[in-house]
């Protein structure tokens, strides 16, 4: 009997509510998480994402094991004696290289390796092997079996057999003072595994220095191996494996990224593991032109995702891509011109080479001719719209300004345009629904670095098969040797250690989340994203001279009165206002309070478009108050085709509000007939309790009880666009 564990890559999401207050994973792409009963079985979709104190509930991932005939095996199965699950989670962020966009991505060749690019380590002052290993948060593996069992992945129960545990000990000076846990393992009433992640811990000993985070900082994001051993009634046993990733909360779970991590894994599987041999010829490395796509399975999801972006971003020019201005299902030759026009508005993929900037993903508009101008699709920033070709003292930094769909998505869209498609029901691809549902709710593109994981998932060398992460070693090896801080799984090509899939992400995650929504991107110079700026103020004196011979003139005199160097590099104009991952990190949203009390505390009417992160005005505030952000939900979800997405569960009590008259800024009283809304945090106990709500009082108690120190930031260089909020 051949076992398989699903999902093959599970995704949990951290939260700061108490240990037992959690939800279970969505069961479809764009689905809501589930409540559970006393047996830990899913019941209804989530009622509230937060507890009464405004803390976010953790989202657990359910794992199931299946036999050779694809039947689920549980402790109720007649031939099953025991099911034991072992999970080894780790966080390697502090021990990895500094974040430098696409530097280190070996899909661009060995010349783009971390060492070839001269990328420094995080916490570079720690050089000894033992010091580097100590930067990893690694509490060793935990095992759980039976029914309704619970094991915490805590500093207080590290297995004696695990010889090299490590974690930030002592009291940290900023943020969360004490690290305690990477999460929880539980089993339900039939022995299925539920993995819950951390509690939103983020702390350090230095000031935060940018969207990559800071040295000597930690968070409790993690990833690692899942191993299932099924023992049968005759005492024989079989083993199967999977992988687990703990990410940040998904604040708009029903809105799906145009290219998800499931799309990434599908693309890798098609082109490297013969996942759909009728679609791709692995011998020639080309897609098959006679492959027949299916509209409902392959094309409609892209259109639906595009239609949802309007609820979390201002992308009016995308409306033509879901307006059904022609019959998208019509595959006739007469309709081909319409389909081709649609397809040609999607930019093509760059070749992954260093130094070639004359490529499709550097192009914003469809044309330079007035009357034929439309931003190409998708309207997202690319995986490096931040740093120019000469940044980091490099001759040829990789620049990727704007997004393109992945290769397989583009191929299927092209087949639709050519008329090589059917409409209606179609056979499913050979991928488990559980596999697609887990990572299908994660960001697939762009990757700068991403939200949950990054561009290493595009590299086939980390997989043993489609959708299946290759494990580097087993429990016995890690018990003795521990984890390796400097090992690059994409370079060695021998599999992943716990912590490898999330180590390239920002540390702490909140730093990048604060700045990972908007990017203003230059679209005129393919190799340039940003440049330094010198502002020079001159004065000019004009003299009138008389009694001069014909043809003689005296030039005006000028002098420099002030020069100012702008230390921060800024986008070179002309630039375009582009989004990163609005479904995961919303920006332009609708207010949703529908009762008197809610509107009094929100200071806004319902239905007003407003900045999602209003009131979170710094990196340090994001680290401390990330759980105050709203969840975006479809308030009309029972009526398919008529969505109404608004904010819900925002912690309004945390924020104070003032209308600032424009005249206060300009000094001109005539400007005072216009005001600007300003939201800011007031977290003192008196302010929270003074709001007069139960939630405000509980929030005040929560802030008093937690162990947290003020977070500072210095030398901040935010991603362009984030500072100014409309």
From Swiss-Prot:
> Could you confirm whether the keyword Oxidoreductase appears in this record?
yes
- Name a single GO cellular component: extracellular region
- Please describe the quaternary structure of this protein: Homotetramer.
Which Gene Ontology BP annotations are present?
Answer: defense response to bacterium; killing of cells of another organism; negative regulation of single-species biofilm formation
Activity regulation comment: Inhibited by aminoguanidine, amiloride and beta-aminopropionitrile.
Q: Which cofactor does it need?
A: cysteine tryptophylquinone residue
Q: What is its EC number?
A: 1.4.3.20
Q: What organism, scientifically named, is this protein from?
A: Marinomonas mediterranea (strain ATCC 700492 / JCM 21426 / NBRC 103028 / MMB-1)
Q: Quote the protein name from its UniProt record.
A: L-lysine 6-oxidase
Per UniProt, which keywords does this protein have? Antibiotic, Antimicrobial, CTQ, Oxidoreductase, Quinone, Secreted, Thioether bond
- Per UniProt, what is one GO molecular function of this protein? quinone binding
């Amino acid at each position: 009997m051949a076992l398989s564990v699903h999902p093959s890559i599970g995704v949990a999401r951290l939260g700061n509510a108490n240990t037992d207050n959690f939800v279970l994973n969505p069961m479809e792409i764009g689905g809501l998480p589930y409540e559970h009963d006393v047996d830990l079985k899913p019941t209804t979709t989530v009622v509230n994402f937060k507890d009464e104190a405004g803390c976010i509930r953790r989202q657990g991932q359910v794992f199931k094991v299946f036999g050779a005939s694809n039947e689920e095996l549980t402790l109720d199965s007649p031939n099953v004696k025991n099911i034991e699950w072992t999970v080894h989670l780790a966080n390697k962020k502090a021990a990895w290289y500094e974040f430098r966009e696409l530097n280190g991505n070996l899909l661009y060749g060995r010349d783009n390796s971390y060492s070839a690019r001269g990328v420094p380590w995080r916490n570079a002052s720690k050089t000894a092997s033992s010091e580097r290993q100590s930067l990893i948060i690694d509490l060793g593996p935990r095992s759980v079996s039976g029914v309704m069992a619970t094991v915490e992945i805590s500093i207080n129960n590290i297995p004696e057999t695990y010889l090299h545990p490590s974690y930030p000990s002592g009291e940290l000076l900023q943020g969360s003072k004490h690290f305690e846990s990477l999460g929880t393992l539980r089993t339900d009433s039939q022995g299925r595994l539920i993995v819950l992640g951390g509690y939103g811990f983020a702390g350090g000993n230095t000031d935060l220095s940018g969207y990559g985070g800071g040295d000597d900082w930690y968070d409790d994001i993690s990833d690692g191996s899942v191993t299932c051993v099924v023992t049968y009634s005759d005492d024989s046993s079989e083993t199967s494996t999977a992988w687990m990733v703990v990410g940040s909360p998904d604040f708009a779970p029903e809105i799906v990224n145009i290219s998800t991590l499931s799309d990434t894994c599908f693309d890798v599987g098609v082109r490297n593991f013969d996942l759909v041999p009728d679609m791709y010829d692995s011998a020639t490395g080309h897609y098959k032109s006679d492959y027949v796509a299916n509209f409902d399975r392959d094309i409609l999801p892209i259109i639906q995702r595009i239609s949802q972006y309007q609820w979390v971003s201002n992308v009016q020019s995308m409306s033509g891509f879901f307006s059904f201005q022609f019959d998208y299902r019509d595959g006739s030759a007469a309709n081909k011109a319409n389909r081709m026009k649609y397809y040609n508005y999607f930019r093509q993929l760059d070749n992954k080479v260093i130094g070639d900037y004359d490529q499709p993903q550097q192009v914003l508009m469809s044309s330079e001719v007035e009357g034929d101008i439309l931003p190409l699709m998708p309207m997202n920033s690319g995986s490096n719209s931040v740093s120019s070709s000469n940044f980091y003292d490099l001759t040829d930094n990789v620049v990727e300004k704007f997004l393109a769909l992945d290769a397989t998505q583009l191929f299927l869209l092209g087949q639709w345009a050519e008329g090589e498609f059917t409409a209606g029901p179609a056979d499913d691809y050979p991928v488990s629904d559980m596999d697609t549902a887990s990572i299908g709710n994660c960001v697939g593109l762009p990757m700068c670095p991403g939200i949950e994981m990054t561009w290493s998932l595009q590299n086939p060398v980390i997989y043993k098969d489609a959708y299946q992460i290759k494990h580097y070693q087993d429990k016995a090896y890690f018990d003795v040797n521990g984890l390796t801080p400097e090992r690059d799984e994409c370079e060695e090509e021998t599999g992943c250690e716990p912590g490898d899939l999330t180590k390239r992400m920002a540390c702490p995650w909140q730093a990048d989340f604060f700045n990972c929504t908007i990017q203003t991107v230059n679209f005129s110079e393919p190799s340039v994203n940003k440049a330094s700026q010198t502002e020079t103020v001159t004065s000019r004196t004009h003299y009138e001279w008389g009694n001069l011979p014909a043809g003689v003139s005296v030039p005006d005199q000028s002098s420099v009165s002030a020069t100012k160097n702008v230390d921060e590099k800024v986008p070179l104009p002309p630039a375009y206002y582009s989004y990163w991952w609005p479904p995961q990190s919303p920006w332009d949203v609708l207010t949703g309070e529908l009762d008197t009390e809610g509107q009094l505390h929100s200071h806004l009417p319902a239905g007003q478009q407003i900045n999602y992160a209003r009131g979170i005005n710094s990196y340090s505030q994001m680290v401390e108050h990330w759980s105050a952000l709203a969840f975006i939900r479809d308030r009309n979800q029972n009526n398919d085709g008529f969505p109404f997405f608004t904010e819900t569960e925002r912690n309004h009590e945390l924020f104070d509000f003032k209308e600032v008259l424009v005249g206060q800024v300009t000094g001109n009283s005539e400007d005072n007939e216009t005001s600007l809304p300003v939201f800011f945090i007031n977290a003192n106990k008196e302010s929270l309790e003074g709001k007069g709500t139960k939630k405000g009082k509980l929030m005040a108690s929560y802030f008093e009880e937690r162990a947290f120190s003020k977070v500072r930031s210095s030398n901040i260089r935010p991603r362009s666009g984030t500072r100014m909020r409309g």
